[in-house]
Curated annotation (Swiss-Prot):
Cited function: Plays a crucial role in elastic fiber formation in tissue, and in the formation of ultrastructural connections between elastic laminae and smooth muscle cells in the aorta, therefore participates in terminal differentiation and maturation of smooth muscle cell (SMC) and in the mechanical properties and wall integrity maintenance of the aorta. In addition, is involved in the control of collagen fibril assembly in tissue throught proteolytic activation of LOX leading to cross- linking of collagen and elastin.
Record bears the keyword Zinc: no
Protein name: EGF-containing fibulin-like extracellular matrix protein 2
Keywords assigned: Basement membrane, Calcium, Disulfide bond, EGF-like domain, Extracellular matrix, Glycoprotein, Repeat, Secreted, Signal
Post-translational changes noted in the entry: N-glycosylated; contains mostly complex-type glycans. Not O-glycosylated.
Annotated site, Cleavage, chain positions: 87-88, 90-93
Classification of source organism: Eukaryota, Metazoa, Chordata, Craniata, Vertebrata
Organism for this UniProt entry: Cricetulus griseus (Chinese hamster)
Amino acid sequence: MLPFASCLPGSLLLWALLLLLLGAASPQDSEEPDSYTECTDGYEWDADSQHCRDVNECLTIPEACKGEMKCINHYGGYLCLPRSAAVINDLHGEGPPPPVPPAQHPNPCPPGYEPDEQESCVDVDECAQALHDCRPSQDCHNLPGSYQCTCPDGYRKVGPECVDIDECRYRYCQHRCVNLPGSFRCQCEPGFQLGPNNRSCVDVNECDMGAPCEQRCFNSYGTFLCRCNQGYELHRDGFSCSDIDECSYSSYLCQYRCVNEPGRFSCHCPQGYQLLATRLCQDIDECETGAHQCSEAQTCVNFHGGYRCVDTNRCVEPYVQVSDNRCFCPVSNPLCREQPSSIVHRYMSITSERSVPADVFQIQATSVYPGAYNAFQIRAGNTQGDFYIRQINNVSAMLVLARPVTGPREYVLDLEMVTMNSLMSYRASSVLRLTVFVGAYTF
């Protein structure tokens, strides 16, 4: 109460109270806003209508409802309902009113049936008409007068829902198993393929399927191996083959020359030789085979790697020919007094680089006189001392190669046998003229 209210008349007191109330409110507090643009949750301001309008959260919020639920918008919010749920709009709300169902007549048919045009009772397909309460994860199967909710193949019922069966837990697959929604798939390791039952794995014959082997392919369990023909070796890539250069491995494969060829090698011999099965080279005896060009007045002499045609009569005055390769100097001829009584022509062949000392030719006296002594010597042709004589006994001696010689080369050695008899003061000599052919090779 005002302190002075008791002193004022009643009318003045009412007037004073009105003035006090009007003065207590400031002009700013009595002003109202020109417009309102803020809306409550679930609404937004519409500038055209100058009113708040509902926000459709089902369109503006991504994945507003999870799983198999469907989003239903309503004023100021939204609902997440099962997809089988139906929503009846309020007749007093916005939008057209729901249609008025026609007048229904009593159904004379048992549950799950309905009359047709002929007034016969036919089954109601609840699955096709969505008159069932099966879960979205279930399959609806129509039955006479009813329906059944079952889980699809590969699913099992857990509570009201159907969940995927992990078939891989039961090891249906031989190798690898991949679980899929409602099913599974078997896979095989490399080198295998699924069998007819789509579960077991069978070996793949890569060799029949164009394996990248260059020469030979061998199939094995789960894989394959490449191999090469004889004379080839497998490359590092495991598929291609490279020729083996056998000639580079050893210098003893062939006696003369080794020639590498694709997948093999061959041995060759020089002219005048033939190749043996042992890969050795053997001299061809042209004189024996007739592969020579000597005339009838000549004698064919074979040596290592070739032959020589020599005259049949090689006797030079004062010698006369008495037989093949033998010349005799008559005693009646004064020119023969200082000459050997006979000269016999012989021929032989040796190889190059022969090991020394080597016995190469044996000299043998054809006749022996009582009390005679025979001495053997090299009369001519040994200017470099490549040979020497080793006397064995009174009637024989050996021609010895003193040092290695390299061909092709030819020696003509006069090997003399001197016969002496001191009691009869007798001295005579004969010569064996030996032609030695040295071949060009060590074989």
